[in-house]
Amino acid sequence: MKTIIATVVLSLISTMTMAQTQETKGKVTDENGQPMCCVNVVLLSLPDSTFVTGATTDANGQFTLTSTNRNSLLRLTSIGYETICMPVSQFGGSVQMHENSQTITEVTVKGILPKTRLTGNSLVTTIDGTVLGQSGSAKEMLAKVPGMMQNGDNLEVIGKGSPVIYINGRLMQDADELKRLRSEEIKDVEVINNPGAQYSATVTSVVRIRTKKRQGEGFGFDAEVSNRQNLAYGQSDPGINTNMRYRHNNFEVFGGINWWNYTSVNDSELQQWSYMKQNGNMLCTEQASQLRNDWVGHGLNSHIGFDWMLAENHSVGMRIDRNDVLNTHTEFDQTTDMKQYLLDSSSLLTHDINSNHQHGKVSQPFSWSSNAYYNGRVGKLGIDFNVDFMTSKSNQTDDIEEITNGISSTMSSSNASSAHMIADKLVFTYPLWRGQLSVGEEMSHVSRQEEYNVVGMPITNSSSKVKEDNIAAFAEYACMIPKVGSFSAGLRFEHVGMRYNNLLDPSKSMTRKTDDFFPSLSWAQQWGSLQTSLSYSIKTNRPNYQFLSESMIYINPYSRQQGDPKLDNEKKQELGLNLRWKWMLLGASYERIDNCLTQWSYIYNDEGVILIKSINMDVPVRNLVMYVNASPTWGRFSPNWTIGFQKPDMRQTLADPREASGTRDISYTRPIFFVNLNNTLRLPHSWQIENYFQWQSQGEAMNFRLRNNTATLNFTVQKCWLKNDALCLRASINDVLQRSDQNVTLDCGYYTLNQLSHSNNHTFTLSLRYAFNATNSKYRGTGAGESQKSRLKDK
């Protein structure tokens, strides 16, 4: 009887509690109707405004709050947006936030001021309505985003290297897509400098680009014609890009075609010294080489896809990309003056003059990639599922004519490779306590086969096949604790199984399996205008498949190159700090890398031939990076200035036969300083003038020494016409000073290399773009297997 009474009492208490509990859930969007992530949403009791509970919106802009207090006030805040307060009783389930407009001397400059806010361990920069939204291509624009910089022709997150890039949640697989995407189409950019457990353990930085969602239906298109003229070498690179889309109700179909022509010239001077003992004497082999490699090609990239919103919280879509290389060839010329002499007496033993001309052709029979996704929500449970497929094949042939001391010979080589990948990624999200729990899995299967055949060369043929399976599971929890801050903790487990088959010599085949855990932690807090974040993570870096290839590449009679299938993975520990106050940003990161991947040079045989080989370093590499960014707006002038340094710390003991002990200690601790100055002046009648200056000092990085300062100066003028600047003409001249050549030294003890590379960036580019009824893609695929795709593409 007591049990029955107790059960009844507990049931009544539970019923009363449920009756008093109120659940408030909704969705937050911006002025363009796009979901807003990471908005702080809190409930305050009335009339004293005491904190009751709080949460942050997820990637879909949704939140859920539970409270027993019916008389509450709902408050929503986000940096750069107006605060919203309303009684819970008046909340209709959705709310739209509006950006703050700032006034300077009674002139409204909304639409000019770039806004960057610190959200956890990421920097979110508004592009739409700012000068950054009128910066030409997405590639040009990203170089001006706080936390990023341009290094030669590559984009980097400062201190993190090249990032993995997503466009509307879809993993970008073709780097040239940034040249085709216009800054006018972009809403905001998120730079994540310490990605959490949801990303592959090889990913050290992420850039997420979100395009604008414009209202309306029907047909829209944009087209661009451009020409890039190389002022130093004379080549011309025209290009045509078109994008089309049709939207009706909740269904959208889209596609695009891009025809490109590209030329590249690599012009460098190379000096090499190697030392070895021979018959009790110190033999020195000295090489002085002039190299020039001309790459000429054109191709056609195309894509087609659809996005279908089945219901309010359910979307599916698919995108297929094809990349055709229609005609590509290379012309490589090398002249080498080789001397061998005894170091002590300078007695000349051998003197050869070698010239080498290679004519190469590259064909790509096929290169396809696709992504399909489902994104939805069932009750409070969020679901994000992606499947990716990628397949490619390429063939390269080289005909070589070599003349040594007047004696000519001919050689040839052929390289055929194919790669296939399939991957999936599933992520569940669920609100829990004051935050959100994310759990998921990611799997990929990669197969790559390569065959390298030579005729007339002093090396052997090779044929290999690599298969790799990657299975990952992860969990991450993020929450906000009032007056303490926002916390995120994640753990990722990755199992990698790799099978290397040497098809010509099975005894050299090998199997390797690794199982690793990768934790990540972050904390963020705001005090008034000061925002802070601190993060820690463990990452890895796996060698790309070219590094694993045992194929020996013939360079000249005195040099060879080869990979190593026995390479280990790197292990990275990273600690990051960000501080933001108004328009000032301080970024700092420290990392330690074990088993660092690099290239090393060895004495290959008794004749002094050099073998350049991929290796793991046997000492840790440490790096400290610090920078300060300022992005104010003074009237129509919007500068974006960054100054900082990167300081390595690596110490080695090198084998050096010139030393009595046979070894020599060496250290790399000299910092590299850098300055990036982006300046934009917005003038009446849709005129815009841009100036970019970059300076980098001498210094050291890993096991390389940069021996000279470099400077780059670019200018751009842009003029737009018609409604919403639909027609834009843009002219740019790059590397005006022509002071961006790089002089690099590599010291391996018994071998030293010095290379002076001449810049290929002195160009003039002219582009004209027209957009009609532009409605941006709603594609929401997030992609899977991003690390495997990048390793397949790395050369």
Q: Can you name each region flagged by the protein language model?
A:
Residues P47-Q62:
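Short, acidic Ser/Thr/Gly-rich low-complexity loop/linker segments typical of extracellular
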Residues T66, K144, R170-G196:
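Short acidic/polar hinge/loop motifs at secondary-structure boundaries
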Residues F91-H98, E106, A138-M141, A175-D176, ...:
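N-terminal periplasmic accessory domains that precede
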Residues M421-K425, A472-F474, D568, E574, ...:
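Outer membrane beta-barrel strand-and-loop segments of large Gram-negative receptors
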